[in-house]
Amino acid sequence: MTLIIYSLGMVDNYPFHLFNGFPNLYGFSGLDRRSVERDKPNWKKKLLNDPNTRFVLNWRSKSLISEPTLGYPSAVKLKLEEIPPNLEATDQYVFLGQKDALWYVGIDISTVDEFELNKGLPEDSSFRDLREVGAILDRFDACILSYCRAIFYWQQNNKFCGVCGSKTAISKAGHQI
């Protein structure tokens, strides 16, 4: 890394002190975001029918977390058949990427009423804010949940064009407005 920076003549500008700090838990985790897959019009149909797809649920900026009696919390990554029927009605999907032959898709279920929310979910799970549990999650879990939350937050706060005021449309598997 240093050799490349020296050859570019950036020695005085490059923040070498950043290499000495703690790693960003929400940063790189090995997830391949597969931008080529986002352009495909049938991405959703393909991934919904793939047994290697895992879904992470996002409800009002909170993530579904498994909290076992013993051990550390972890992200709940569900197969399609494990998602309760009352949560499948949403059309808010975002393709997150692929890692170790598994595809990851985020689902925003914020429109689901709080009383209907926990029906059919794993017993030891609940929706938690990442600020409460993010630091003790596995790095991959923290990364994928924060990435999912960030995309849905971005979508929710950009429903209308900042220039003309018209309603925006989400495309490219949730990554473009």
Predicted regions and their residues:
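N-terminal amphipathic/basic-hydrophobic helices that include classical n-h-c signal peptides
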Residues: 1-9
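N-terminal alpha-helical interaction blocks
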Residues: 8-137
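Aromatic-residue detector
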Residues: 56, 105, 142-145, 162-163, ...
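Generic signal for short, ordered secondary-structure residues
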Residues: 127, 139-143, 158
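Solvent-exposed, flexible loop/coil residues
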Residues: 131-134, 141, 156, 172
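Short, charged surface segments at domain edges that flank catalytic/cofactor-binding sites
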Residues: 135-153
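Cys/His-rich short segments
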Residues: 147-177
